[in-house]
Amino acid sequence: VLGSPLTCDFACISLSDLLTPWEKIEQRLRGAAAGDFCIVLYNPSSKKRTDHLRRACDILLEIVPPETVCGLVRSIGREGENCTLTTLGELRDTQVDMLTTVFVGNSRTRVMDGRMVTPRGYRGV
């Protein structure tokens, strides 16, 4: 849908603090950012948790540059599927819901032909 945002290693982190304390989520976000992982965020927002994506972006922005390529996909594999490319700096103020999956690129992620691509390291890519 987005292109090839995830290659090699990546982290998948839920932003729901119903079963995981927010402090643990913060620790995971910082670790993934420090390790230069591509990061997938799910459960980014709900009726009660409207600010978790903003808070997660603030944590990532402590380590990751604001121009980092990000992608949003709503309703993956369902009718009405929609994808958007943005940057981490812009993602902070983006409206999302529980049907949205957020992809944060790493230092090698680029937009190529309108797609989010994280190269595996081959020459010329």
Outline where the language-model segments fall:
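Class I SAM-dependent methyltransferase SAM-binding "motif I" and its flanking Rossmann-like core
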Residues: 1-38
